[in-house]
A protein has these predicted regions:
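Short amphipathic alpha-helices in soluble, non-transmembrane regions
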Residues: 1, 10-14, 82-92
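Conserved active-site and cofactor/substrate-binding residues in soluble primary-metabolism enzymes
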Residues: 1-9, 51, 78, 82, ...
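Midchain, well-structured core segments that form catalytic/ion-binding scaffolds
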Residues: 1-77
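A short linear hydrophobic-aromatic micro-motif
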Residues: 55-57, 97, 129-135
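Active-site proximal loops enriched in glycine and acidic residues that flank catalytic Cys/His/Asp
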Residues: 58, 70-74, 100-102, 135, ...
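Zn-dependent metallopeptidase/amidohydrolase metal-coordination segment
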Residues: 62, 120-122, 129-192
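A common structural junction motif
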Residues: 89-96, 189
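Short proline/glycine- and acidic-rich turn/helix-capping motifs at secondary-structure junctions
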Residues: 100-112
Length: 198
């Protein structure tokens, strides 16, 4: 739950659905504190790329006009069209119009791709350990690379996840290790070294 959704929840407790308006009523009922899209009928798990996530990006109310933006990140096992149709169906009960402001397909690159193998070998060359590969729903720069790149690091085994938190940070030694891994990966890319060569 983010600040905007928490504010709507507070308003919904203090006022009736008629008083807060259709959009706030919809947000309170269909989103509330959820991030998995369950109440919207969107909850989806994908063993390859993880769960669908939803959050309220912003809400703007001025006079009789109200707008809200939702950030929905869906797994590779479903389509943006199916997400849009279900969201529109859920919003129709509150007589709300829905339009897509921006759409980016989820990014997924197979673990056995040459790029992933090369990056994994760079990680192993520096750390001496096999990397733990995983996907996230993050809206990273890698999406802009058209499937020819991916986000790479700097999370290590047993790290506490504090991404986007107030105390987001990285240990200095791990930062330098990550820099070494990136340099090794760039060197391997430049020299055309495959994952089998050391």
């Amino acid at each position: 739950c983010n600040a905007a959704a928490a504010l709507v929840e507070l308003l919904a407790k203090a006022y009736t659905s008629t008083e807060i308006g259709a959009i706030c009523d919809f947000i309170d009922i269909a989103l509330g504190n959820e991030t998995d899209g369950c109440s919207l009928g969107l909850k989806t798990h994908c063993s390859i790329s993880g769960d669908l996530t939803v959050n309220l990006g912003y809400i703007h109310i001025e006079g009789n006009e109200a707008r809200a933006a939702f950030d929905i990140r869906y797994p590779v096992s479903i389509t943006g069209g199916s997400v849009y149709r279900q969201f529109r169906y859920a919003a129709k009960h509150n007589k709300l119009d829905v339009k897509v402001l921006n759409h980016e397909k989820p990014l997924y690159i197979q673990k056995d791709s040459e790029l992933v193998k090369l990056l994994s070998s760079a990680y192993k060359a520096v750390t001496g350990e096999e990397p733990e590969l995983y996907t996230t729903g993050g809206g990273t720069y890698a999406r802009k690379l058209g499937g020819k790149g991916l986000a790479f690091g700097p999370a290590f085994k047993d790290d506490e996840v504090n991404m986007h938190n107030a105390d987001e940070s990285i240990d200095k030694e791990k930062f330098f290790t990550h820099a070494q891994i990136c340099l090794e990966a760039m060197y391997r890319m430049y020299c055309g070294i495959s994952d089998n060569e050391n």
